[in-house]
Regions:
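Sequence termini and other peripheral, non-core segments
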Residues: 1-16, 22-25, 29-33, 47-167
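Short conserved micro-motifs on helix faces and helix-strand junctions that flank
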Residues: 35-37
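Conserved, mostly hydrophobic/aromatic
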Residues: 40
Length: 167
């Protein structure tokens, strides 16, 4: 499971679609509707949020916005849809999910690691996107401006829950 802190516009097609599916799974996990992935480290920051389900809905909305911009069709009805394990409705009633959800802090070191990881993955599977990624990074300016709208950059190293890889 990879829930990127980077802005969705930086993700290639595979990363964007995988992130959408995996965040939908995270939404189910946070509702108590699955047995698996309940202790997955990628969920730590959402569990620490005062409104975890709303935060996941806001995150998914950001992915869907990027999908719309690319002409993809992500089913927004899945965002906040359904009920939790207690039967409570989880419907997302907020038109602008970012207006009422506190931002999640993400250390600059985490963003730097994720960007290096994404570049490594994209280099092997889509060299054309790698070129576009470099152009998008140059256009967006400093790394702090390259986060998903739900996140707020703070000073710091890679998150302790991150399982780092050498590449």
């Amino acid at each position: 499971m990879r829930i990127w802190s980077l802005h969705p516009c930086l993700l290639d097609r595979r990363a964007l679609v995988a992130c959408w599916r995996e965040t939908l799974l995270a939404q189910k996990v946070l509702r108590g509707l699955t047995r698996g992935y309940t202790n997955h480290p990628q969920l730590i920051r959402f569990r620490a949020h005062p409104q975890p389900l709303e935060a996941v809905a806001a995150y998914l909305s950001g992915l869907a916005d990027e999908a719309d911009a690319r002409g993809y069709s992500f089913n927004r009805a899945l965002i906040g849809a359904g009920e939790d394990s207690a039967g409570k409705s989880c419907a997302d009633k907020v038109e602008n999910p970012y207006a009422s959800v506190a931002r999640i802090p993400v250390p600059l070191g985490q963003l730097e690691y994720e960007l290096a990881f994404l570049r490594h993955k994209v280099a092997g599977r889509d060299p054309e996107w790698e070129q576009r990624l470099s152009e998008r990074l140059a256009a967006r300016g400093e790394l702090a401006a390259r986060t998903h709208p739900l996140f707020e950059v703070v000073p710091g190293a890679i998150e302790p829950w991150e399982k780092t890889k050498d590449f």
